[in-house]
Swiss-Prot record:
This is Deoxyribose-phosphate aldolase. Keywords: Cytoplasm, Lyase, Schiff base. Signal peptide: none annotated. GO terms for molecular function: deoxyribose-phosphate aldolase activity. Pfam families: DeoC. It comes from Salmonella typhimurium (strain LT2 / SGSC1412 / ATCC 700720). SMART domains: DeoC (SM01133). The active site is at D102 (proton donor/acceptor), K167 (schiff-base intermediate with acetaldehyde), K201 (proton donor/acceptor). It comes from the Bacteria. InterPro entries: Aldolase_TIM, DeoC, DeoC/FbaB/LacD_aldolase, DeoC_typeII. Catalyzes a reversible aldol reaction between acetaldehyde and D-glyceraldehyde 3-phosphate to generate 2-deoxy-D-ribose 5-phosphate.
């Protein structure tokens, strides 16, 4: 197996196959569930809006892939600093049956100098998730934070507040995951000594098998080749799947999605 084939198979099994569009429908989510079951293995999860969780759960069970996890988003995509709303949305997502919640960090508050609200918001959501055995990923929106110091700070605050994963981006801003921001965030995981318990998720902008290979190489360099399993690494993407499947000898690499 070539290096690109090997990394593509790894990446496919680490994907949170995503649809987070305003025009999402039950039919589109059902199609996403079908796509998550591939000829070479299943994606780790799907990521959808909360209202679609019940139909996704039913579809995944019916197609014989109940182990594909269901992730959803809260405080999304703007990362407002209203803790009560973020917590209410997170509790609602848990009630819908989410296995994982990707909450947006109040990044604009951090840019304005307020570190406390980010900690408090993540901690409140973490407490709700922990009580329900739900995984919490925190989206820090690196493309809006821009500066290394802010990316580092948001990562540190999120981890201290209990994040199970730190995630680069919503996919809804001009700049999403980059290798540079990925390295900074994974260096924080390393430097804080939390690589056993905290994972990393690049999202948005990882579109090709070659992109995925680059992002995995950074993880392998920092943590060794065994670290990036589905408990420690995910790709938030949709168009990536077609490229990975093409690299693995399935399909033409074309995707209907841009995330």
């Amino acid at each position: 197996m070539t290096d690109l084939k090997a990394s593509s198979l790894r990446a496919l099994k680490l994907m949170d196959l995503t649809t987070l569009n305003d025009d999402d429908t039950n039919e589109k989510v059902i199609a996403l569930c079908h796509q998550a079951k591939t000829p070479v293995g299943n994606t780790a999860a799907i990521c959808i809006y909360p209202r679609f969780i019940p139909i996704a759960r039913k579809t995944l069970k019916e197609q014989g892939t109940p182990d594909i996890r269901i992730a959803t988003v809260t405080n999304f995509p703007h990362g407002n600093d209203d803790i009560d709303i973020a917590l209410a949305e997170t509790r609602a997502a848990i009630a819908y049956g989410a296995d994982e919640v990707d909450v947006v960090f109040p990044y604009r508050a951090l840019i304005a100098g307020n570190e406390q609200v980010g900690f408090d918001l993540v901690k409140a959501c973490k407490d709700a998730c922990a009580a329900a055995n739900v995984l919490l990923k925190v989206i820090i929106e690196t493309g809006e934070l821009k500066e290394e110091a802010l990316i580092r700070k948001a990562s540190e605050i999120s981890i201290k507040a209990g994040a199970d994963f730190i995630k680069t981006s919503t996919g809804k801003v001009p700049v999403n995951a980059t290798p540079e921001s990925a390295r900074i965030m994974m260096e924080v995981i390393r430097d804080m000594g939390v690589s056993k318990t905290v994972g990393f998720k690049p999202a948005g902008g990882v579109r090709t098998a070659e992109d995925a290979q680059k992002f995995l190489a950074i993880a392998d360099e920092l943590f060794g080749a065994d670290w990036a399993d589905s408990r420690h690494y995910r790709f938030g993407a949709s168009s990536l799947l077609a490229s990975l499947l093409k690299a693995l000898g399935h399909g033409d690499g074309k995707s209907a999605s841009s995330y």
